[in-house]
Amino acid sequence: MENIKTVSKLCRSYGIPLFFDACRFAENAWFIKVKEDGYANRTPKDIAREIFSYGDGCTMSAKKDGLANIGGFLAVNDEELASKCRKELLITEGFTTYGGLAGRDLEAIAVGLNEVVEEDYLRYQVGFVKFLADLFVQNHVPIVTPPGGHAVYIDAGAMLPHIPRENFPAWALGCALYIEGGIRGAEVGAVMLGSQAGKQVNGVASRSSHVDDSDFKDENELDDNVFEEDIEHEELFRLAIPRRTYTESHMR
């Protein structure tokens, strides 16, 4: 919370609006409760209210701490900006009363936002992630510690030292997990974070929203140094835990 207060004060001193990525607001509120002095006796809902009081708005993916399978929202405290957003919404998603979402999904989000700040739920969710992290540690699988509230990150670079970084060890681990066990995860490394946007590297196109056919080379023409500046990224593989889905037996 102290970090949020400091950033909020700095932004306001320069007249800069502060917007939160609120997709995991409840988990953040829980960690503030259990880790930060002065918050142990406050509820996650109360802590969340304080967090948002320091901002000017937020974006929210309800697939995370909305406990829904689709949807989200944009919240602002500026009526002029809100009016502009409504006009954009009308031509892209629909009326503000539903924003392109079905009634069922709106109801799921409404229920989810209430349930996600319940202490029993947050204790279970964060504890479940820690349970999986502890299993990895016990089996000498290198992970990022301490674990957070939604996923465990395997250090694929350390786990697979025989695979050079330019050959994407985290990507390789993801493929192997899916082939062997049907386990889906996400590479968080050079392929996702590489700065060679729109370039083909070892036959793989790095992530970019502006890809031009001229950016792609024949595999035989690849420059051995094209990825040199990207291999400094950690090679991680994320195993996000679906909420209220698995038991400890599944994790074992």
Describe these PLM feature segments.
Residues M1-V141, I154, P164:
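Conserved PLP-enzyme active-site core in the AAT-like
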Residues G94, K130-R252:
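Conserved C-terminal alpha-helix-loop-beta "cap" of PLP-dependent enzymes
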